[in-house]
């Protein structure tokens, strides 16, 4: 199942706000920008995979689906009120679900958007 539409950043202006004001976190294959303090009962996510990563839309869409699946995996742990943009870097083209899972867990933890009251192993 994909990421519910209520949990997605959909508008260009929302992406721009996160790009301009969000705090940057980087891992080897992913870059994440996080903007907090939004008064909402959930966090919203946007995923960007540029044509620098792959010219083929099918490849870019596959990467986005994998990242959305990882976000769904962590959804019970994610604190509300954040807008997050995840950018796949060109070297991320060869990543699989498990690699994205490890990297996003580290990035979410680094950014402070995961509630550590839940154990990851409990979710698996």
UniProtKB/Swiss-Prot annotation:
GO MF, one annotated term: 3'-tRNA processing endoribonuclease activity
Keyword set includes Nuclease: yes
EC number(s) stated in the UniProt entry for this protein: 3.1.26.5
Keyword Nuclease: yes
A Gene Ontology biological process term: tRNA 3'-end processing
Keyword tags: Endonuclease, Hydrolase, Nuclease, RNA-binding, tRNA processing
Quaternary structure and partners: Consists of a catalytic RNA component (M1 or rnpB) and a protein subunit.
Record family assignment: Belongs to the RnpA family.
PANTHER family the UniProt entry points to: RIBONUCLEASE P PROTEIN COMPONENT (PTHR33992:SF1)
Name of this chain's protein: Ribonuclease P protein component
Annotated gene: rnpA
């Amino acid at each position: 199942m994909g990421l519910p539409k209520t949990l997605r950043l959909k508008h260009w202006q929302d992406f721009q706000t996160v790009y301009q004001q969000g705090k940057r976190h980087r891992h080897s294959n992913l870059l994440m920008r996080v903007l907090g303090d939004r008064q909402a009962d959930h966090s919203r996510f946007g995923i960007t995979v540029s044509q620098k990563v792959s010219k083929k839309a099918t490849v870019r869409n596959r990467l986005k689906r994998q990242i959305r699946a990882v976000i769904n995996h962590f959804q019970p742990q994610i604190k509300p009120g954040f807008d997050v943009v995840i950018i796949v870097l060109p070297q991320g083209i060869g990543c699989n679900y498990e690699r994205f899972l490890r990297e996003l867990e580290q990035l979410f933890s680094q950014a402070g958007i995961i509630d550590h009251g839940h154990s990851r192993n409990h979710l698996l």
